[in-house]
């Protein structure tokens, strides 16, 4: 069971990571607007990308739970792929639904008069870009798990080496005492 401080640390890391992604994408959108001669206000660019990233930040714990429950391992690989495939579609749709709801508030462009119209437009333009985001979260969780396993293996190997050294010392020490007498 994860401690509360561990949960807070992980939640803070998720929020910080998604905030960084939002700011990087907002910066890219702002620069692209300047280059095209279509200036985009920084507040508007950052608002748009913060909403997108906040939706993914809210969806990240779901992806992490699924990554832990259905790890991409040889034993049940196809089942895990199926679960994550469905989850990636569901999370992408959820992200677009949240963004379609918030888009008018943050000043997103190319909106339709209705939420459904905006959602449909997003479905056609950003769905294929949102699906891999889920897979990146799952891949990051997998890499973290592999790193944690490697650290644990190294720790156990160090303990084993130390135990062997202590056992060897215990075996050698009586012989020296006996020979000294």
Model-based region annotation:
Residues 13-17, 86-87, 125, 181:
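Alpha-helical transmembrane segments of MFS and MFS-like solute carriers/permeases
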Residues 57, 61, 135-138, 179:
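Generic alpha-helical secondary structure signal
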Residues 157, 161-181:
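Histidine-centered phosphotransfer motif of kinases
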Residues 65, 142, 146, 167:
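Solvent-exposed, charged/polar functional surfaces in cytosolic regulatory/catalytic domains
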Residues 57-58, 128-129, 170-171:
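Hydrophobic alpha-helical transmembrane segments of integral membrane proteins
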Residues 1-82, 96-119, 150:
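N-terminal sensory and localization modules of signal-transduction and trafficking proteins
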Residues 86-157:
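Cytosolic coiled-coil signaling helices that couple upstream sensory modules
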């Amino acid at each position: 069971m994860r401690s509360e401080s561990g949960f807070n640390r992980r939640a803070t890391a998720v929020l910080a990571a998604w905030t960084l992604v939002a700011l990087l994408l907002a910066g890219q959108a702002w620069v692209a607007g300047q280059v095209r001669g279509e200036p985009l206000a920084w507040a508007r660019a950052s608002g748009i990308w913060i909403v997108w990233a906040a939706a993914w930040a809210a969806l990240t714990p779901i992806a992490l739970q699924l990554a832990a429950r259905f790890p991409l391992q040889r034993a049940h690989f196809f089942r895990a792929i199926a679960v994550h495939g469905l989850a990636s579609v569901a999370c992408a749709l959820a992200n677009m639904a949240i963004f379609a709801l918030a888009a008018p508030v943050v000043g997103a462009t190319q909106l339709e008069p209705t939420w459904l119209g905006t959602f449909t437009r997003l479905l056609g333009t950003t769905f294929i870009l949102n699906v891999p985001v889920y897979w990146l979260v799952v891949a990051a969780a997998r890499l973290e798990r592999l790193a944690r396993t490697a650290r644990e293996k190294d720790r156990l190997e160090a303990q084993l080496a130390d135990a062997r050294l202590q056992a060897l010392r215990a075996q050698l020490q009586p012989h020296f005492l006996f020979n000294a007498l």
